[in-house]
Structures are given as structure tokens and as C-alpha cells.
Amino acid sequence: MNNLNQTIVAPTTNISTQAISLIRISGDDSFNIINKLLKTKIKEEKNVWVRKMFDGQELVDEVVITSFVSPASFTGENVVEIACHGGILNTQRIINLIIKNGARMANKGEFSQRAFLNNKIDLIQAEGINDLIFAKNELALKIGVNNMSGAHNQSIINLKGNLLDIISRIQVSIDYPDYDDVEGSSIPELAKALSGINEEVNNLLKRSKMAIKNTNGIKTAIVGKTNVGKSSLLNALLNEDKAIVTDIHGTTRDIVTGEINLENISLNLIDTAGIRETTDIVEGLGIEKSLKIIDEAELVLFVVDFKSINDEENKMIFDKLENKNYILVFNKSEFINDIERNKIKDLHNNFVYTSAINNDIDNLIMKIEQMHINEEIINNDSLILINLQQITLVEQVKDRLEKSLNAIIGGMPIDIVNVDLHEAWDYLNQLIGEQYDEEIIDNIFKKYCLGK
């Protein structure tokens, strides 16, 4: 665990050639340290100050200082934020002066960690900050903002309250077995109450698992025969020349990857080697990889040429896709006539036309969004978690609740039921940060940016 008694400093903006850099100091000595660098001192109060900063008698910079007094700050400590002129040398020089005068460099996420430890934010809010910073699309951004603000955290508090009520009823029954008239402590009443809590937890888990696919990225394989336009499609989707495109069959021999972020969904794209019969050992290894990636993909974009759709290679790919989520992509649409389009319409229902070489891929984007964007998630105003560690904790809560419910219905001794309920309670506390392991907390905040 970081030493909370030390005053820390870090840049809150990237150190680069830019107009303005922001530097944050947090800790008991924040005002003392900054005043060592000023001829005209600032008071220990919430305010904004324009000051000249000195190293001894040498002018360093003219800065704007925003000061906050404990506990009314992000970290809950005395905080001084300095807006100085940008530039790598100037920013680093000021940070070095602050360290020289009594601060130490903050670790990654240490400001947020102090905010959590000083009860300024709970753990869901802290994770929400990181979700917001690393958001890849609008859905992730919305969830990050909601969780950072604590807008929906009351739902966890309510779950805890309802669970504690059940635990208390059971404990009374254990401690006073002769009293059989404790309100709400009969087996049917306990089972009903537990079922309600379990349903809420299941709904939270369902929402979160649906959302995390869209926010973290859906593993999307681009597959097909050689020379049907797979690499051109990847380049068009990424809007860059990531993959080599030639008229020579078998150009792509290894896996080429990229990422595309749409409004409410992200795709982790994988361009695979063209699938065909070959005696080339290197190309054959690439084809083996392609077939393996089809198995692992969550979405497959199967690129085909209409004129060869029924040949052996395509039939083999169709067989691999029997139980997969896929879109049939008729690329080079400029060469498909109306008669051929009518035949396609009669034979297939999940297809799109594209012309990657002309960047005409809007139909494909729309189809992907239709298949994977759930309006229930987009418009949902309830708590959604998009962090794997949080989802794991919710799964543990669900597991203990279901064990307890099955035990009650199965006539198990009530004290055994209470053990699982106490564990569910502990996991809810860990989720919101009211109960934690110091090493786990350190690991959580190490994922954050320096200065956050």
C-alpha cells in the first residue's frame, strides 16, 4: 500500500510539446511546497491564483494555481493544481522542483486511490473513472460516466440492505429456535425474498455481460478464399492500408489485425489467410491458423465472390460456420448484376454487398450494428459493469445466492444457508469497496494513468 502520509505530485496531462501542462500536488504539505517556489505566497484556501514561480532567484514560469483545502478536494487532501506553459523540459523542470522541495512522484492511479481510501468515492466510482478514460465507443463512455458519478450505485446498497435483512432474520431463528413467529423467517418467505435478490443480481450480470462484449471489442474474423477482397475489406474498415493487397493469390500468409470503434460497439478485426488447397508449406500454416480463428471468433465476415460461391473451398467454410455468428459479404459488388442479386436474395438472408476498393462498406457496418447492438443496453438506465473483476465478483454473489436458495428449498439446516449468504454479503462489500484486500486495491489502481 502506498504511503498516504507523503505529499505526491504528477502531471495530469501528457508531457509533450503543447500549450499548457497541468501538474497536481496532493497531501498535507501541498501548500508549504508550492509556497517555497513563490515570492508572493498563496493562502491555504480554495481559490485560483496567478503567480510567478522561481527556483531561488531565477524565474521558472508564470502559472495559474488552483487550490483546494482538505476534505473538499478530489483526493480528500490538500490539493494544488498548477497550469504551466507546456513543453517537455518546462513541465519536467517544475515537477523536479516540487519533488526537490518535499513531494515524491505519485504512482499510477495514486490520486484516485487516495480518493477511495479517504471515502471520497467508492470502488465502482473509481473503476468508472478508468472506464471513462479508456472508453473506445459511446456505450463505454456512457457507462463510465454513470459509474464515475455514482448515479446507479444505490442499487448495490439496496441489494446489501435486502440481503442483510434476510441474514438477520435467519440469525434470529438460529439464536432463538423456540421463537417460530419471527416475521418473514418462514421457509416460503425466505425463499421468496432470496429469489427477488437473485433475480436482481442475474439482471445485473446479464446487462453487464452483454455490454462488455460491445465495449471491449467483438473478436471478428474476416475469412474467405484467396483474392476475394478480404485484405481490401480490412483496409476499408480501418481506413488505412494495414494489409497488402495484390492480384496474386495467397498474398496474406499470416494474421493481420486491427481495431475499429463504431458508435456503440468495437470490433477486434482479424484478416486471415485465404483458404484453398495448396502445396506451399508456409501458406498451409496460415490456412490452418485461419480455420482455428474461425472457431475462436465471435463474429465472422465471410467474404465471397458470387461466381464461385458453390465451389469446394467455400463449401468447407460454410460447414465451419454452421453454428457461428456470421455475415456473408459479397465484395466487389460493382461486378454483380441484377439477375445474380436476385439469386442471392433467394438463397441467403444474412448477407450484404460491399465494394471495399471503393470504400462502399456502409451496408456492412449497418448489418453489424443491427446484429450486435442491443437497444435494451444502449437505453438502459440501470447499473452496468464493464470490468472483468467486477463481473467476477457479481458471479460469486450469484453463485452463493443460488446455493442458499437451493439449500432452503431442499430443507438444509438454516445455519448452513447463512454461511453462503454471509459470503454473498462479503462479495457485495468487495464490489463497492467497503471490504478489500490491500494488495488487490494496489493492483486495481496500478492500471490507471499517471496523474489520475
Swiss-Prot record:
Binding locations of Mg(2+): 231, 252
Record-listed GTP binding positions: 227-232, 246-252, 271-274
Localization annotation: Cytoplasm
Residue intervals of the TrmE-type G domain: 217-373
One GO molecular-function entry: GTPase activity
Cofactor(s), names only, from the UniProt record: K(+)
Highest taxon of the lineage: Bacteria
This enzyme's EC code(s): 3.6.-.-
Primary subcellular site in the record, as a coarse category: cytoplasm
Cofactor, free-text remark: Binds 1 potassium ion per subunit.
A Pfam entry, by short name: MnmE_helical
Keyword Zinc: no
Binding, (6S)-5-formyl-5,6,7,8-tetrahydrofolate: 24, 81, 120, 452
EC top class named in words: hydrolase
Record's keyword annotation contains Cytoplasm: yes
UniProt keyword annotations, A-Z: Cytoplasm, GTP-binding, Hydrolase, Magnesium, Metal-binding, Nucleotide-binding, Potassium, tRNA processing
One cellular component (GO) term of this entry: cytosol
Binding site for K(+): 227, 246, 248, 251
Any one GO biological process: tRNA methylation
Protein family membership: Belongs to the TRAFAC class TrmE-Era-EngA-EngB-Septin-like GTPase superfamily. TrmE GTPase family.
Role: Exhibits a very high intrinsic GTPase hydrolysis rate. Involved in the addition of a carboxymethylaminomethyl (cmnm) group at the wobble position (U34) of certain tRNAs, forming tRNA-cmnm(5)s(2)U34.
Subunit field text: Homodimer. Heterotetramer of two MnmE and two MnmG subunits.
HAMAP family given in the database record: GTPase_MnmE
Protein name per the record: tRNA modification GTPase MnmE
The organism of origin for this protein: Mesoplasma florum (strain ATCC 33453 / NBRC 100688 / NCTC 11704 / L1)
Lineage of source species: Bacteria, Bacillati, Mycoplasmatota, Mollicutes, Entomoplasmatales
Gene name in the database record: mnmE
